[in-house]
Amino acid sequence: MMTETLQIRQIDDANKFQFISLLLIGDESEKMIGRYVDRGTLYAGYIGETAVAVCLTTDEGAGVVEVKNLAVRHEFRRRGIGRRMLAYIESINSGMTIQLGTGETPSTLRFYESCGYVYSHRIHDFFSDNYPAPIIEEGITLTDMIYLAKKAGHQSAD
C-alpha cells in the first residue's frame, strides 16, 4: 500500500472548535473536551486539504506532556495515521515523558503498546465518575482510565 503524505499542522486557539467532530471521535463528551481544550495544543493531520486526524496535548509540568485526545476519521484508520501523529508529538517533545489515558479496550491498549508506551497507572472509576452514560467499546463497559507513558526520543525495547 502506498503511504499517503500526512501533513501535520498546529491549529490556532481560535480555530480549535472547527475540529470538534474529530475531537468527538477520541472523546465522546463535549463537556469533557471543554475541560482540556483551552489549555491544550491541537494538531491536525491532513491528507491533501482534508483533516483526517487530530491530537490534542497538554503540558502537565515536570517534563510531562499528556495526549488528551488522539482521533483518526474512521475511513482513514489502519493506515498508520495515528502512529504518525504520535511520532510527530514525540519528535517535537524529545526528552519529555509522553503520557496518555485510555479505556481498557484491548485493541487500543495493543496499539499504544506497539508504539512503545508502557503501563504507568490507573484512575479507578474515571469513566463512571466523569461521563453521564456508560461508554462501551468492543463490548467492554469502560470504568477505569489506564495511563501509559513513554520517554520521547527513546525507542521501545522490542
Residue ranges of model-derived segments:
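Conserved GNAT acetyl-CoA-binding A-motif
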Residues: 92-104
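Conserved beta-strand in the GNAT
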Residues: 44, 50-59, 63-71
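A short, internal acetyl-CoA/4′-phosphopantetheine-binding micro-motif in the GNAT/acyltransferase core
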Residues: 70-77, 103
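Conserved acetyl-CoA pyrophosphate-binding loop and the N-cap/start of the following alpha-helix
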Residues: 76, 80-88
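Conserved N-terminal entry element of GNAT/NAT acetyltransferase domains
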Residues: 1-14, 146, 154-158
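Conserved active-site tyrosine of GNAT-family acetyltransferases
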Residues: 111-113, 117
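Conserved catalytic-core motifs of GNAT/GCN5-like acyltransferases
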Residues: 99-101, 118-141, 145
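Helix-loop element at the rim of GNAT/NAT acetyltransferase active sites that forms part
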Residues: 10-17, 22-34
